């Protein structure tokens, strides 16, 4: 992540620019420039080694004007309060634009979850749920999965929160497993929305899916589902990336095989090398953004398209699946 870039300052600048274009006085939108509440918590966890590590967690509630705050929880080594504030702000704007009666919230823990065992991950999640329990709830703030979090983590979170309040409270989070009240289709929903956006784009511009070369940055819940569904749509997916790097193939990748492989939580760096050219790490993700493609889909972290690489992008269309 570019440490010189402050995502919250960027979010505020965009609001100011939009307000100026609309001719609004700052009195009309000043409340949108600051979060209602931001919480930082320390999360001590006894690791499998016996050593205690203390992790930093965050929960930000940007606005509850339209209803309870809504927004995911991400686990990432680079997560910080400014990133979480920006994401909460964007959630408030998205819910408002979509006409959904929710406000904007976001949470995160500064951690590389790939370093943690399942037991350590559960312990960290439970600590976090207990720590932020006083400010969340089905009528106050409802978390959900985000980067590096999933239904299992939501189940642990829900259980820990329920312990804290003294009753089973499944409505405290969305993105839960079906067995405890989750929604059928929720896991694929965002990626399916991306696919439908691409389908509408093709219809509007009179393009055939089979003629479209697509690059997808990100192979998690959003990116992985997008790759699978675009393959079913008939698009030629020529590049996919994850945190380990990018896999590129001019002839097109086997979308179903990549989806099955990734569903087992395996990284692309270990995928069949005969499938294409693998470029490791940040270099791979940078190469994907400027590869020869018709449609580029950023579906990972924010701030990937910058002033430095924007002019190098060859894609005719960019479908925005990431947060910022």
What is each model feature region?
Residues 1-184:
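N-terminal ligand-binding/catalytic initiation module
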Residues 114, 152-154, 221-232, 310:
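Short glycine/threonine-rich loop-to-helix capping motif typified by GTGT followed
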Residues 182-290:
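Glycine-rich phosphate/diphosphate-binding loop of Rossmann-like nucleotide-binding domains
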Residues 2-6, 201-202, 316-324:
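Adenosine-phosphate binding glycine-rich loop
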Residues 136-138, 207-211, 291-293, 310-317:
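Short, surface-exposed connector motifs at secondary-structure boundaries
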Residues 295-324:
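ADP-ribose/adenylate-binding Rossmann-like module
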Residues 163, 199-207, 299-302, 324:
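Conserved helix-loop functional segments at active or binding sites
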